[in-house]
From Swiss-Prot:
Gene name for this UniProt entry: panB
Quaternary context: Homodecamer; pentamer of dimers.
Enzyme class label: transferase
Reactions listed under catalytic activity: 3-methyl-2-oxobutanoate + (6R)-5,10-methylene-5,6,7,8-tetrahydrofolate + H2O = 2-dehydropantoate + (6S)-5,6,7,8-tetrahydrofolate
Family from the record: Belongs to the PanB family.
Name used for this protein in its record: 3-methyl-2-oxobutanoate hydroxymethyltransferase
Gene source species: Enterobacter sp. (strain 638)
Pathway note: Cofactor biosynthesis; (R)-pantothenate biosynthesis; (R)-pantoate from 3-methyl-2-oxobutanoate: step 1/2
UniProt xrefs under HAMAP family: PanB
Binding residues annotated for 3-methyl-2-oxobutanoate, in chain numbering: D45, S46, D84, K112
Coiled-coil region: none
Taxonomy of the source species: Bacteria, Pseudomonadati, Pseudomonadota, Gammaproteobacteria, Enterobacterales
GO biological process, one term: pantothenate biosynthetic process
């Protein structure tokens, strides 16, 4: 089996073929996801909440991400694997490069960082040194204390700022962008404006791809359930069928529906 590359996702965007991605944190689930057809996975700092039981992503360390990256890579050797750089792991370009190198050595193909135009120098530093970068705009969970909670971003005048940030990051060299919890109308503007693939979560069905936290897809999230989440396991009956249903619904545009979207 050939490894999945960013070129495949670029081709999907050009051909307007939606693609499904998911978070993964261990060998067994990564193997299951790969076997059922998911070719792109994210070792997200969401593991701080879903795996470690914290109330935010802030306690997650680079060592945590590297540990889970190694496990996922063993389970899905051919997937395109993205790994988060966690809170305060990229305060300077030099720090970002050191920590990105550790995560790449663990098996990541690309690192994801949260933030806007202030990250331009960091993105350039990484890409010039052969570290592919995925950006993340909108609701960026590492900034939860600044936002005052998990709220929809990019409404009103903030939408233009977000679009400008996306264009600046693309010009700096990011190869993917995650858009989280933004109005559908803004998600479409960003997706149309960028030449790189855009992956949405809580951004409607207008982005090139979708991502879900695996616990949300299986309905095993404790506490608050995000509006954009859907429990595919309740309809499918078993985990493998749930993954296949998730992929099919993303590719057809059925998911996310209006009930999962913001305006």
């Amino acid at each position: 089996m050939k490894p999945t590359t960013i070129s495949l996702l670029q081709k999907c965007k050009q051909e307007k073929k939606r693609f499904a991605t998911i978070t993964a944190y261990d060998f067994s689930f990564a193997k299951l996801f790969a076997e059922e057809g998911i070719n792109v996975m994210l070792v997200g700092d969401s593991l701080g909440m879903t795996v470690q039981g914290h109330d935010s992503t802030l306690p997650v360390t680079v060592d945590d991400i590297a540990y889970h990256t190694r496990a996922v890579r063993r389970g899905a050797p051919h997937c395109l694997l993205l790994s988060d750089l966690p809170f305060m792991a990229y305060a300077t370009p030099e720090q970002a490069f050191e920590n990105a190198a550790a995560v790449m050595r663990a098996g990541a193909n690309m690192v994801k960082i949260e933030g806007g135009a202030w990250l331009v120098d960091t993105v350039k530093m990484l890409t010039e040194r052969a570290v592919p970068v995925c950006g993340h705009l909108g609701l960026t969970p590492q900034s939860v204390n600044v936002f005052g909670g998990y709220k929809v971003q990019g409404r009103g005048d903030a939408g233009q700022i977000l679009l400008d940030d996306a264009l600046a990051l693309e010009a700096a060299g990011i190869q993917l962008l995650v858009l989280e919890c933004v109005p559908v109308e803004l998600a479409k503007r960003v997706t149309d404006a960028l030449t790189i693939p855009v992956i949405g979560i809580g951004a409607g069905n207008v982005t090139d791809g979708q991502i879900l936290v695996m616990h949300d897809a299986f309905g095993i999230t404790g506490g608050h359930i995000p509006k954009f989440a859907k429990n595919f396991l309740s309809e499918a009956g078993d985990m493998r069928a749930a993954v296949r249903q998730y992929i099919a619904d993303v590719e057809s545009g059925v998911y996310p529906g209006e009930e999962h979207s913001f305006h």
